[in-house]
Structures are given as structure tokens and as C-alpha cells.
Amino acid sequence: MTRQNAYSRDQLLASARGELFGPNSGRLPNDPMLMFDRITEINDNGGSHGKGLIRAELDIRPDLWFFNCHFIGDPVMPGCLGLDAMWQLTGFFLTWIGAPGRGRALGCGEVKFTGQVLPTATLVTYEIEISRVINRKLVMAQSDARMLVDGREIYAAKDLRVGMFTSTENF
């Protein structure tokens, strides 16, 4: 598939099935772990580092699966799901630029949570700025990211790392 600068939910789910970039390319997780509904912008020269920018959105609805179990009587989106979305998007970037293999989160330097996503919210926006791409024996991207709920930043992460592996048997 030719690289696009935006992707619909159907296209993201095709990525989960290995149909968007091919069966041997990196994949996004399928529902319910896919943590965004669309990528509204992706490029390989934007962001504050000039190495790539991804913007994505998740529509918040009270019936989202995590509100029913986290927590009963006090529903809130788990912070780890927002962090995972940042890793998902960083990995998608690597697949989008043609890096071979399957993506795996390798860590992050710093994470801050300064708010929460409640069922009354309407929109989560992710902004991922690629700070480094290594494309040698090790294929890895490093990024800085933030997550906004209804326009207010509530999560920030620095030095997110995702690697691509042609074999994950010994990972």
C-alpha cells in the first residue's frame, strides 16, 4: 500500500489483520486494544525534532470496555492504555516508513499523568513527535508524546522506545 498521511478506523483494523502494509509487516493490535479511532496526520519530517509527527484521535463513549471494569462506580480510562496508544503509534510510524518486522515496546524515559479520562469526555488526542530513528541491525524509533482530553494535556511521555523484530521467539 502507498503511504498515506491519514488513516481511518477501517484501515487501522486492516493493519491489525496484516492487510494494510502486508502480512510480514508490523501490525497494530485489534479491538479492544487498539486505542485510537483514526490517524489524522502522519509525516516523516514534522514535529519539534523534524523527524516525524503523528496525530491520532479516540472518540470517548461511556460504553467503552474499560469503563465497565476500571473502576466499578468510579469509571476512568486506565493510564496504561493511553501510554500503550503512544507506543502503538510509534510502532505504526516504523511500519509506515517501511521498517521490517513486528513492533515491541522497549520502554520509556519518563511518564507524567496530570489528569484523567472520564466517560463524560468526548475526545482524546495523541501527538507523537519522533525524536530518533535507528535503521541498522537494530530498528528502533524514539519519540516524545502527549495525550489530550477535550483539548487539555493530561499525559506526557519522553523517550518512548519501540523496536522492530523479524523474530520475537527469543525476545
From Swiss-Prot:
One of its GO terms (molecular function) is (3R)-hydroxyacyl-[acyl-carrier-protein] dehydratase activity. Its main location: cytoplasm. It catalyses: a (3R)-hydroxyacyl-[ACP] = a (2E)-enoyl-[ACP] + H2O; (3R)-hydroxydecanoyl-[ACP] = (2E)-decenoyl-[ACP] + H2O; (2E)-decenoyl-[ACP] = (3Z)-decenoyl-[ACP]. Pathway: Lipid metabolism; fatty acid biosynthesis. Its EC number is 4.2.1.59, 5.3.3.14. SUPFAM superfamilies: Thioesterase/thiol ester dehydrase-isomerase (SSF54637). Keywords: Cytoplasm, Fatty acid biosynthesis, Fatty acid metabolism, Isomerase, Lipid biosynthesis, Lipid metabolism, Lyase. One of its GO terms (biological process) is unsaturated fatty acid biosynthetic process. It comes from the Bacteria. It is found in: Cytoplasm. The active site is at residue 70. InterPro entries: FabA (IPR010083), FabA_FabZ (IPR013114), HotDog_dom_sf (IPR029069). One of its GO terms (cellular component) is cytoplasm. Belongs to the thioester dehydratase family. FabA subfamily. NCBIfam families: fabA, PRK05174.1. Necessary for the introduction of cis unsaturation into fatty acids. Catalyzes the dehydration of (3R)-3-hydroxydecanoyl-ACP to E-(2)-decenoyl-ACP and then its isomerization to Z-(3)-decenoyl-ACP. Can catalyze the dehydratase reaction for beta-hydroxyacyl-ACPs with saturated chain lengths up to 16:0, being most active on intermediate chain length. Homodimer. This is 3-hydroxydecanoyl-[acyl-carrier-protein] dehydratase. The lineage of its organism: Bacteria, Pseudomonadati, Pseudomonadota, Gammaproteobacteria, Lysobacterales.
